[in-house]
Amino acid sequence: MEMRNTTPDFILLGLFNHTRAHQVLFMMLLATVLTSLFSNALMILLIHWDHRLHRPMYFLLSQLSLMDMMLVSTTVPKMAADYLTGNKAISRAGCGVQIFFLPTLGGGECFLLAAMAYDRYAAVCHPLRYPTLMSWQLCLRMTMSSWLLGAADGLLQAVATLSFPYCGAHEIDHFFCEAPVLVRLACADTSVFENAMYICCVLMLLVPFSLILSSYGLILAAVLLMRSTEARKKAFATCSSHVAVVGLFYGAGIFTYMRPKSHRSTNHDKVVSAFYTMFTPLLNPLIYSVRNSEVKEALKRWLGTCVNLKHQQNEAHRSR
């Protein structure tokens, strides 16, 4: 009979050890995360500050940046604190919080990316009807639905995962609490939960991904009909980069949540999880925003305003 551990805590074994190579990787990862937080925060600031960006497309981008910032903040602070202090314990409640927020934000982002693909389809394929096809009311509904559907998935995963009894040393070979990893420690039959989670993943991952591919397929068909070679190249480059980032994000999610149990590897899980929780949030603002000419112009205007304000403050200080 398997012994059940009565301690309320779990132990996160982490992503890094204390070798020189891993210390360098840890510092590089922190730099990546800080860059990601800064770039996403800047995106939200610009969209809020510049009235020219007060359009559905940029509102969706601001929500994507907010989700990315929250996704990074859910996992990295705890991971960094564990590595620096050596205290790798996490309470059952803390584990539940991570399990809730990861599907909430990851699932919400899946639906939000589908909404953004629809927005691009409406703008490219039906530019004259765009205000009707992508009204503010529809934009807000899609955004709210993305958050609520993600939260529903997160709540179900957190409640179901923490309802199982856990055995052994409560050691989680990961750097944060994730449902597919945690249920491996359960000393109970988890097959019903795993089947339910697979069905959820079909709805949360494959359905939005199919909608995105369909939208970009229609966009590509419209792009090929453009008369201007330069416009065609620009649109194709933009669409291909969007599809590449979307494919990486969904691919990581499908690999983590829909892979057969017999093919699971803790090392692979950690690498893929690090990618979609830390590196994808950095790629999103770079691909969706920084390459956008309107965002670049907004950034120039904002920097110019900051310089002028600083100059005025210096002049006022000198006149005293």
Swiss-Prot record:
Localization, UniProt: Cell membrane
Keywords: Cell membrane, Disulfide bond, G-protein coupled receptor, Glycoprotein, Membrane, Olfaction, Receptor, Sensory transduction, Transducer, Transmembrane, Transmembrane helix
All ranges on the Cytoplasmic side of the membrane: 48-55, 119-137, 218-234, 291-320
Domain of life: Eukaryota
A single GO molecular function term of this UniProt record: olfactory receptor activity
Extracellular side stretches: 1-23, 78-98, 157-193, 258-270
Subcellular location, principal: membrane
GO cellular component: plasma membrane
Regions crossing the membrane: 24-47, 56-77, 99-118, 138-156, 194-217, 235-257, 271-290
GO biological process entries: detection of chemical stimulus involved in sensory perception of smell
Glycosylated residues, chain numbering: 17
Membrane topology: Multi-pass membrane protein
Disulfide bonds: 95-187
Function field: Odorant receptor.
Family note: Belongs to the G-protein coupled receptor 1 family.
Protein name: Olfactory receptor 2T12
Organism the protein comes from: Homo sapiens (Human)
Gene designation per UniProt: OR2T12
